[in-house]
Swiss-Prot record:
One Gene Ontology CC term in the entry: cytoplasm
Name used for this protein in its record: Gamma-glutamyl phosphate reductase
Database matches in Pfam families: Aldedh (PF00171)
Localization terms from the record: Cytoplasm
EC numbers: 1.2.1.41
A GO term for molecular function: glutamate-5-semialdehyde dehydrogenase activity
Organism encoding this protein: Nitratidesulfovibrio vulgaris (strain ATCC 29579 / DSM 644 / CCUG 34227 / NCIMB 8303 / VKM B-1760 / Hildenborough) (Desulfovibrio vulgaris)
S-S pairs: none
Keyword annotations: Amino-acid biosynthesis, Cytoplasm, NADP, Oxidoreductase, Proline biosynthesis
Classification of source organism: Bacteria, Pseudomonadati, Thermodesulfobacteriota, Desulfovibrionia, Desulfovibrionales
Family note: Belongs to the gamma-glutamyl phosphate reductase family.
Chain coiled-coil ranges: none
């Protein structure tokens, strides 16, 4: 069977499985998720062995450190995946819930019911944990899903796929509800993008090149998990000691992830006191500063002059753009020009400035006096996420179970006819 036929067959089987899954009981779905958590714990050694094969191949191919970090599984990350399974299992099941109702003058009772999106195709790179997160969220929301991970994670993804299949079968749910593409041929992506008859929405999660390619090729709606060019604005009068720790966490904890900080905008009033403290705190961790002319002398030996192309750059590394700004207007203008609608934060003591920043900074999460690293489904209480949408339709921000459903109108009558 050639690739086109193989992918079309997967789409047909996903559509059939999705119809069954949409009618599945909450107990059956929760049972599959709980069993998957147990399997992840019991089969940890096999998962780590598969991941080791991927890591060895990636190292031989010269993969850079940030991508290696995203590829790597550990006992701790497997424990986190198991915990996410149990957390999502315990969440309220949205499918079939009638969220709101109102009565019309003619007596009709009108409501909106939560329903699955249908069949989702997920295309992603490097991260094996996305295989589990995507599967459990789609399952909970009643969606079938076709998962196409990166070739660099193929052994890890297939090992996890086997556990998902086992968990589904254990409670009588269709194994085809979650399918992982087993071939690494990149032609698969183009074939998935053609299947509008069988796939309702496609979600690319990865580098800018992948996302643009999917947007260009897809015949169905695309929910984009675009790059994370995240900024922090240090307001006049901010708590500088607190801000230093926020910036350190946002940049240094995991510099290769999409909610890591990439740009630091500092009010001119605070630059002389704040930037040397930042240089000392972050410089000890090897952060390189790409600095504007005004900030360069305040950052010491760790700073180099910024270039125009550094604006809007997702560095995925221990590199931070630094600019001094005159006021919030200039900070917001920079964010509007170079941000990616992902995450923006402000450090301030001024409530009015905080509320203005929340209103005017255009991003899927805007935070006051907190790290950008909190833009994450688990951290925001969603249990897990299939991605962080930077598109405002159909969802904006981390996509959990609720965001993988839509609504339909339901009407209760007593024989009414339209006049």
């Amino acid at each position: 069977m050639n690739i086109a036929s193989q992918i079309e067959d997967m789409g047909r089987r996903a559509r059939a499985a999705g119809r069954r899954l949409a009618a599945a009981s909450p107990a059956a779905k929760a049972g599959a998720l709980d069993h998957l958590a147990t399997l992840l714990e019991q089969r940890q050694d096999a998962i780590l062995a598969a991941n080791a094969a991927d890591l060895a191949a990636a190292a031989e191919a010269g993969m850079d450190a940030p991508r290696m970090d995203r590829l790597r599984l550990t006992p701790a990350t497997i424990a986190e995946m198991a915990a996410a399974c149990r957390h999502v299992a315990a969440l309220p099941d949205p499918v079939g819930a009638i969220e709101t109702q109102w009565q019309r003058p003619n007596g009709l009772l009108v409501g909106k019911m939560r329903i699955p999106l249908g069949v989702i195709a997920m295309i992603y790179e490097s991260r094996p944990n996305v295989t589990i997160d995507s599967a459990i969220l789609c399952l909970k929301a009643g969606n079938a899903v076709i998962l196409r991970g990166g070739s660099e994670a193929i052994h890890s993804n297939l090992a996890l796929a086997a556990l998902i299949t086992e968990a589904l079968s254990s409670v009588g749910l269709p194994a085809e509800a979650v399918q992982v593409v087993s071939t690494t041929d990149r032609a698969v992506i183009a074939e998935l993008c053609k299947l509008e008859e069988h796939i309702d929405v496609i979600i690319p999660r990865g580098g800018e090149t992948l996302i643009r390619a999917v947007v260009d090729m897809a015949r169905m709606p695309v929910l984009k998990h675009y790059k994370g060019v995240c900024h922090a604005y240090i307001d006049s009068g901010a708590d500088l000691a607190q801000a230093v720790e926020i910036i350190h966490n946002a940049k240094v904890q995991r510099p290769g992830v999409c909610n890591a900080l990439e740009g630091l905008l500092v009010h001119r009033d605070e630059a002389a006191a704040f930037l040397p403290a930042i240089a000392e705190r972050l410089g000890n961790d090897g952060v390189e500063f790409r600095a504007c002319p005004a900030s360069l002398p305040l950052l010491g030996d760790s700073a180099i002059p910024m270039k125009d192309e550094d604006n809007g750059q997702e560095f995925h590394d221990l590199i931070l753009l630094v600019r001094i700004v005159d006021d919030m207007d200039e900070a917001l203008a920079h964010i509007a020009a170079y941000g990616s609608n992902h995450t923006e934060i402000i450090c301030t003591r001024d409530h009015g400035n905080a509320m203005r920043f929340l209103r005017e900074a255009d991003a899927s999460m805007v935070a006051v006096n907190a790290s950008s690293r909190f833009n994450d489904g688990g951290q925001l209480g969603l249990g897990a996420e299939i991605g962080i949408s930077t598109s405002k339709l159909h969802s904006y921000g981390p996509m959990g179970v609720q965001e993988l459903t839509t609504t339909k109108f339901v009407v209760f009558g007593a024989g009414q006819i339209r006049q």
